[in-house]
Regions:
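Active-site-adjacent loops and short helices of periplasmic peptidoglycan-processing enzymes
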Residues: 1-100, 109-113
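Penicillin-recognizing serine hydrolase domain
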Residues: 63-213
Length: 213
């Protein structure tokens, strides 16, 4: 949201530099990779590419510190009173958010057409260092088409475990789903399917327990 709110040109070229590579080693974006801001946003949302996310922050006016400040201001505007952001990627354990705050963020992010589209993009092939590289959406439910998902993001650090947040439409009702600290790699996705199935079986017709949208 901060990237899009900034109105910075989406076709501006950004370069993955040595600092990005040194800070985030698990990435297929090699040093020297050239991306547009739009491509970096797509890879960050779809494939959880941390170098892409960090590069977006580094190329924000004022750099990463200003970007993080903007993230925290945005959170405050949204009423996320139990959240704090420490870096653009979410990989630092100092990044914290409550489940309810994450629903607030989901509701706000859903208003951005590009975030909806990019976060639910199944896969993408890009030429990186003169070689085609295929990037997959980190949410297997998006790739399989098992659910009607309007927005989603996966995440993982040791302190938080496997996490998943998403907006999905079940029985023509938009639901905000938050799964934190899932035990296994696939359990968060299986839990989402279980919630969908349970909701569809509710007697007397489906109705939201708590309407958040």
């Amino acid at each position: 949201m901060v990237v899009l709110d900034s109105k910075l040109p989406l076709d501006e070229t950004l370069v993955i530099n040595a600092d990005d590579v040194r800070s985030y080693r698990t990435s297929r974006l090699a040093g020297g990779t050239v991306l547009t801001r739009e491509e970096a946003l797509l890879l960050a949302l779809m494939s959880s590419e941390n170098r892409a996310a960090y590069t977006l922050g580094r190329n924000y006016p004022g750099g990463v510190p200003a970007f993080v400040d903007a993230m925290n201001r945005k959170a405050k505007e949204l009423g996320m009173d139990h959240s704090h952001f420490a870096d653009p990627t979410g990989l630092l354990s100092e990044n914290v958010a409550s489940a309810e705050d994450l629903t607030r963020m989901l509701s706000a992010a859903y208003q951005y057409k590009m975030i909806r589209e990019f976060s639910t993009w199944p896969d993408l092939t890009m030429v990186i260092a003169k070689r085609p590289q295929k990037f997959l959406n980190t949410n297997r439910l998006v790739r399989s088409g098992d659910m009607n998902i309007g927005l989603q993001k996966t995440g993982f650090i040791n302190a938080a475990g496997k996490c998943l947040v998403m907006q999905a439409r079940v029985n023509n009702t938009p639901l905000l789903l938050v799964f934190l600290d899932s035990v296994g790699t696939q359990s968060r996705f299986a839990d989402a399917v279980r919630v969908r199935d349970w909701y569809e079986r509710m007697p007397g017709g489906a109705h939201p327990i708590r309407r958040l949208m």
